[in-house]
From Swiss-Prot:
InterPro entries in the cross-refs: Ergosterol_Biosynth_ERG27, NAD(P)-bd_dom_sf
The organism's taxonomic lineage, starting at the top: Eukaryota, Fungi, Dikarya, Ascomycota, Pezizomycotina
GO annotation, biological process: ergosterol biosynthetic process
Family recorded in the similarity comment: Belongs to the short-chain dehydrogenases/reductases (SDR) family. ERG27 subfamily.
EC number: 1.1.1.-
Residue stretches in coiled coil: none
Name of the protein this chain belongs to: 3-keto-steroid reductase erg27
Additional free-text comment from the UniProt record: In Aspergillus, the biosynthesis pathway of the sterol precursors leading to the prevalent sterol ergosterol differs from yeast. The ring system of lanosterol in S.cerevisiae is firstly demethylised in three enzymatic steps leading to the intermediate zymosterol and secondly a methyl group is added to zymosterol by the sterol 24-C-methyltransferase to form fecosterol. In Aspergillus, lanosterol is firstly transmethylated by the sterol 24-C-methyltransferase leading to the intermediate eburicol and secondly demethylated in three steps to form fecosterol.
Length: 450
């Protein structure tokens, strides 16, 4: 087989990594990847490999069985069920995103095992909430239902939650690491950087590799303090981490962030020197998404309260909320669209915003009253609709219900957001380099003591 034939075969194979897949949104993303792939990629040579992560082997095995069962059902409607089923492969991996040693170990296994990654869906997360302010929740739902079940103000979280020690170097050498920050942002950030060789090898026919950050509708820049980027002093560490996620993804292609983004996209180790005539592969594209408001277990509730929450979500949808997807399968709409669509489709979707001076878009899963889902642009505090100054430019965005108190983006606010993006990228790269050095030192120490 010639090199070109080999490359064509690899180009027909799609590899997608999904973190946090044992339940909820992550599991539904895996299921929907299968469904959408079998619908849109019908050639018998085209295949999909879904690499999913859980926190334990037991959870991984259980998730694998449930995904295989879903694949059998999805393939049953195909003209050749066995052939359709054979084109999809699941691979279970373990990782604890609050443990940087675990993240590094996963990265090494991925780089040794797979030829490329076409997309990584950074979904796993930690809420960090310890309870609910019930009087405030009941009053808010009774008097302002749609707003309170979209942007709730009644969740309780403590400040100062930190991870367990990452290394054996001791407290004098190892700085504190925020638990929610690490699980939601920094663990993924380290994983994406370490997987850069695979993302850069992506030769999928519809564009470069994709880093897809799963954020939240609740993210707002007011929750982020650049001097407390890990959210150790805030009582809203989850919202702070998701605001940071938004900022990193939306400002990744700006000139002001370029020095640090280039460092993030760099490959630490080149297994073979590149030939003089060989072009450097393009860096991945970074995308931002959220699942709308769906029923997951990220906020621990008893079953009666969980179903009461779903009932409130249904009522909010009937009252005109565009974001209450309710089911995690509908919530997976936008992440899967970003993972599998041709690059031209994504470019066309962003084009109206870029033509009007904007940039990256936060793509959210949206539902109408009948439950029909679609990916749509989400308004972001400080970034507006796709970074366009002024009112929404698309009719769909103008008609969509806004957050109460939302105002049109001003040029000054956009500049402030871009400057915040520059500072966040700088801090994140400094943290990554610091922790890579600490992990290297810990590994060297462990080897010397062995």
């Amino acid at each position: 087989m010639s090199d070109r034939d080999s490359q064509n075969d690899l180009g027909a194979k799609v590899f997608v990594l999904v973190t946090g897949a044992n339940s909820g949104l992550g599991f539904s993303i895996c299921c929907r990847l299968v469904d959408e792939f079998l619908k849109s990629h019908r050639h018998p040579r085209e295949s999909l490999t879904v690499i999913f992560t859980t926190r334990s082997t037991r959870k991984g095995n259980d998730t694998l069985l449930r995904l295989q069962d879903h694949l059998r059902r999805a393939s049953a409607s195909a003209s050749a069920p066995a052939a359709a089923s054979a084109r999809v492969t699941f691979v279970a991996e373990n990782v604890d995103l609050s443990n940087l040693v675990s993240v590094r170990a996963l990265s090494r296994r991925l780089n040794k095992t797979f030829p490329k990654l076409d997309a990584i869906v950074l979904n796993a997360g930690l809420g960090g909430w310890t309870g609910i302010n019930w009087p405030k929740a009941i009053w808010g739902v009774m008097t302002d239902l749609v707003h309170e079940v979209s942007w709730p103000s009644f969740k309780i979280a403590p400040a100062g939650m930190v991870t367990d020690a990452q290394t054996a170097l001791g407290d004098d050498k190892e700085p504190r690491l925020g638990a929610v920050f690490c699980a939601n942002v920094f663990g993924h950030y380290m994983l994406a950087h370490n997987a850069m060789p695979l993302l850069r090898h992506s030769d999928m026919l519809h564009g470069p590799g994709r880093i897809i950050w799963v954020s939240s509708l609740e993210a707002t820049v007011k929750h982020l303090d650049i001097d407390d980027i890990q959210g150790l002093r805030t009582l809203a560490p989850y919202e702070s981490s998701k605001a940071l996620t938004d900022i990193l993804a939306l400002t990744a292609d700006l000139p002001s962030t370029a020095p640090w983004v280039k460092s993030f996209y760099s490959v630490d180790e080149q297994p073979e020197p590149r030939k003089e005539t060989e072009l450097e592969p393009p860096h991945p594209n970074m995308f931002l998404t959220h699942p709308g408001i769906c029923g997951t277990g990220i906020l621990p509730l008893s079953w009666p309260l969980f179903y009461s929450m779903l009932a409130a979500f249904w009522l909010a949808r009937l009252l005109g909320s565009p974001w209450h997807t309710i089911s995690t399968y509908a919530g997976a709409c936008a992440p899967v669209w970003l993972a599998l669509s041709a690059q031209a489709v994504l470019d066309d979707a962003e084009a109206p915003y870029r033509r009007n001076g904007g940039g990256r878009v936060k793509w959210g899963s949206s539902c109408n009253r009948l439950g029909q889902d679609q990916p749509v642009c989400t308004e972001v505090d400080g970034w507006g609709y796709g970074g366009v100054v002024g009112p929404a430019i698309l009719e769909g965005d103008r008609r969509r219900r806004r957050k109460r108190g939302a105002v049109d983006l001003t040029a000054e606010e956009k500049l402030q957001y871009e400057d915040l993006g520059r500072k966040c990228w700088q801090r994140m790269e400094e943290l990554r380099i610091q922790w890579d050095e600490l992990l290297d030192e810990a590994e060297a120490q462990a080897k010397s003591e062995a």
